[in-house]
């Protein structure tokens, strides 16, 4: 009776992704410094415009994580069509629910919290990896700097731990474009993905491009054979550019002792 809806449901059950996601330039556009968690909010909502089977939420941190789907309501007994979920402050249960949604099929699940709280999520995330579930974990407030909440909210060892988890893809974008390409790459995976997104504003970089989907690429080609190769991700890419500018300036030390006084 409803062939178009039946075809759409079958496509969702197969885990197919709308090609429109990969040609939507709105998710790439930004002309001012912006935290990549804010960039992620733009990207999620653009994806939802093409994939209404996107389904997820945050552990009571939606406005901070920027993970609310603006054009949908919250899933509830009187709002079965809602694609946002109020998970509450229970990170492990949230991740387990996301796994269940992914296992059922048809819906593309994501969940979110602060990066530092990913330790609560880890057992369920590891099961996502073992079961090859395409759950997206949006982990925000990633930064080497201490924010207004102090060191209790400063992720340090969490990044290394998640990168060491087998069959888990960790994306740490540097700006709007890289955030969009990270989400696009994640949508092609049959495995969990982690979006490590910054707390603070970051500049929009000229050289970032779709090569971000490869995992790593050269941002600035050297004029000759390089003596040093600088590598960075996320919020440190901006600092890497500044370091490269400093290191590329020739300095003559005619009298070293003079610089020590």
Question: Residues of each region from the PLM?
Answer:
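Thiamine diphosphate
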Residues: 2-196, 201
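Short boundary motifs at domain starts and secondary-structure transition points
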Residues: 46, 218-223
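A short, charged/proline- and glycine-enriched loop
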Residues: 51-52, 223-228
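Short, well-ordered secondary-structure micro-motifs
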Residues: 69, 148, 205-208, 241-242
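Conserved strand-to-helix beginnings and helix N-cap segments that scaffold or border functional pockets
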Residues: 121-122, 240-241, 261
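Aromatic-enriched
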Residues: 202-219
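Long hydrophobic segments that form regular secondary structure
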Residues: 226-253
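Conserved small/polar residues in nucleotide/adenosyl-binding loops
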Residues: 254-261
């Amino acid at each position: 009776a409803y062939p178009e809806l039946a075809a759409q449901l079958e496509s969702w059950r197969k885990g197919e992704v709308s090609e429109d996601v990969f040609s939507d330039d709105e998710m790439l556009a930004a002309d001012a410094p912006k935290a990549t968690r804010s960039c992620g909010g733009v990207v999620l909502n653009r994806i939802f415009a093409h994939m209404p089977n996107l389904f997820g939420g945050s552990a009571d941190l939606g406005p901070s994580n920027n993970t609310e789907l603006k054009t949908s309501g919250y899933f509830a007994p009187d709002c079965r069509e809602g694609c946002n979920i109020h998970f509450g402050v229970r990170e492990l249960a949230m991740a387990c629910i996301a796994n269940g949604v992914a296992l059922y099929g048809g819906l593309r699940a994501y969940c979110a919290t602060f990066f530092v709280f990913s330790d609560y999520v880890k057992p369920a995330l590891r099961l996502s990896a073992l079961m090859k579930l395409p759950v997206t974990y949006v982990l925000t407030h990633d930064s080497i700097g201490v924010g207004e909440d102090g060191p209790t909210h400063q992720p340090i060892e969490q990044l290394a731990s998640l990168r060491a988890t087998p069959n888990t893809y960790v994306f740490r974008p540097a700006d709007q474009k890289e955030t969009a390409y990270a989400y696009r790459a994640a949508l092609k995976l049959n495995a969990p993905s982690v979006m490590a997104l910054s707390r603070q504003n970051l500049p929009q970089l000229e050289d970032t491009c779709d090569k971000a989907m490869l995992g790593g690429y050269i941002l600035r080609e050297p004029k000759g054979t390089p003596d040093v190769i600088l590598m960075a991700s996320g919020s440190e890419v901006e600092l890497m550019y500044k370091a490269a500018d400093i290191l590329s300036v020739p300095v003559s030390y005619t009298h070293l002792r003079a610089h020590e006084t």
